[in-house]
């Protein structure tokens, strides 16, 4: 498949290559798609996701198009190439974050959906109300968002959506993953339906949404439910999934996957950062959280540098954060591996105080040039609901145990979860 224009060389945190294998690891795939959906936004975690891992090999193609009545459609086309030349493709649609997005959400009239070319899409959309009996009907704002993003601007006679469809038809063994949060998830569903109308096989279209509303009526569901794979991830306490069915007569379809936010998460359950945190926890629960590389196994890390030795990570937190301790250690180890693949990890011995002399001896044994010591501390803030101040301390020693540098950074959870705060603090170092 061809890469679209105006490539932005960004990168995404620890995306597992084998998440897109012929038989994908579902927890890894869901983490990839959650991270991609968050990376499509702006904000601290989104910037962190976009800033991490050129070595992971992802190129992100960003597009933004103004469509009908000022609707702004946006998407990111993420492409990664394997060593054998095979390409992995993912389309992520941002959710609501701009004034134009709010206008899109509020345009809740129903519009007809169908056609087999962009011009037909518009003609069907404008079908008079009295002639729409038995037709698939969808949310007008979501429809215009999808139309603007993929089926408005034509380059060399084809819109972005038409090029995607042509490439997929020409390569029937390839798959396209579409994802998004809230409004972005609604756009992903409609985009898959449009690509299906352009002749793309159901086996090639895989959609995952996070906290997305229903997009169409019973006729839409009946027409498209077997024409692509749809997984709907729903967070407990997220009200958006129930916003549209009653007033517009819309229906959900596809496989529903229920998640629950971590107890230490203070953010509103609809927030995409809550979904990212839950996806990462499930990934660690599936794989060995005591080892690094949990979602980089088998990948070449282009950030390998001089050999360093990472001592057991010391974590001293309030009892309220006790359940998070293994996740905090695991995500910090993975972040260090992403920074330097030549890192040698000490056995995860957390009993007793850290013996710097003994650890320096172990560092020399493995030929490390330097030794890293990390300490995570955290305490709950008074009179604040599940809000914590986390501190990440880092000390660097030479191979003989002499201190070379030390520093500490701290941040408060809230918009970010405890795991995400540790990643954020690590990135500031």
Task: List where the protein language model places each region.
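Boundary of Sec targeting at the N-terminus
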Residues: 20-22
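A conserved cap/lid and substrate-binding interface adjacent to the catalytic center
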Residues: 59-179, 197-204, 227
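Lipolytic serine-hydrolase domain surface
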Residues: 217-302
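Bacterial N-terminal signal peptides
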Residues: 6-18
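Amphipathic beta-strand/beta-sheet edge segments enriched in Tyr/Trp
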Residues: 373-419, 423-425
């Amino acid at each position: 498949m061809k890469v679209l224009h105006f490539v932005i060389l960004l990168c995404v945190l620890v995306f597992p290559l084998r998440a897109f294998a012929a038989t994908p690891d579902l927890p890894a795939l869901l983490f990839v798609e959650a991270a991609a959906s968050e990376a499509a936004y702006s904000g601290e975690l989104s910037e962190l996701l976009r800033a991490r891992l050129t070595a992971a090999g992802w190129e992100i193609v960003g597009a933004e198009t103004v469509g009908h009545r000022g609707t702004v459609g946006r998407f990111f086309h993420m492409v990664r190439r394997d060593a054998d030349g095979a390409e992995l493709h993912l389309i992520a649609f941002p959710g609501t974050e701009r004034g134009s997005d709010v206008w899109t959400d509020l345009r809740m009239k129903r519009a007809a959906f169908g056609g087999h070319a962009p011009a037909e899409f518009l003609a069907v959309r404008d079908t008079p109300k009295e002639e729409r009996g038995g037709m698939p009907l969808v949310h007008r704002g979501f429809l215009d968002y999808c139309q603007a993003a993929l089926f408005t601007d034509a380059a060399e006679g084809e819109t972005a959506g038409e090029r995607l469809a042509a490439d997929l038809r020409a390569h029937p063994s390839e798959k396209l993953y579409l994802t998004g949060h809230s409004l972005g998830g609604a756009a992903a569903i409609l985009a898959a339906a449009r690509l299906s109308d352009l002749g793309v096989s159901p086996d090639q279209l895989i959609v995952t949404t996070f906290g997305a509303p229903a997009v169409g009526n019973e006729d839409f569901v009946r027409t498209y439910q077997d024409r692509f794979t749809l997984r709907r991830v729903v967070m407990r306490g997220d009200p958006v999934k129930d916003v549209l069915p009653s007033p517009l007569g819309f229906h959900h379809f596809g496989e529903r996957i229920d998640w629950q936010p971590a107890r230490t998460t203070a953010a509103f359950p609809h927030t995409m950062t809550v979904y990212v945190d839950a996806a990462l926890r499930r990934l660690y629960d599936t794989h060995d959280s005591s080892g690094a590389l949990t979602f980089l196994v088998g990948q070449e890390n282009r950030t390998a540098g001089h050999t360093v030795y990472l001592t057991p990570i010391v974590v001293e937190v309030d009892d309220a954060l006790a359940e998070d301790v293994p996740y905090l250690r695991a995500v910090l180890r993975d972040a260090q591996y992403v920074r330097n693949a030549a890192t040698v990890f000490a056995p995860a011995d957390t009993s007793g105080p850290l013996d710097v002399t003994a650890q320096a001896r172990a560092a020399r044994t493995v030929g490390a040039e330097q030794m890293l010591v990390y300490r995570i501390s955290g305490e709950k803030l008074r009179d604040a609901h599940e809000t914590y101040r986390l501190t990440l301390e880092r000390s660097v020693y030479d191979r003989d145990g002499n201190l070379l540098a030390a520093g500490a950074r701290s941040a408060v959870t809230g918009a970010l979860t405890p795991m995400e705060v540790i990643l954020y603090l690590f990135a500031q170092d």
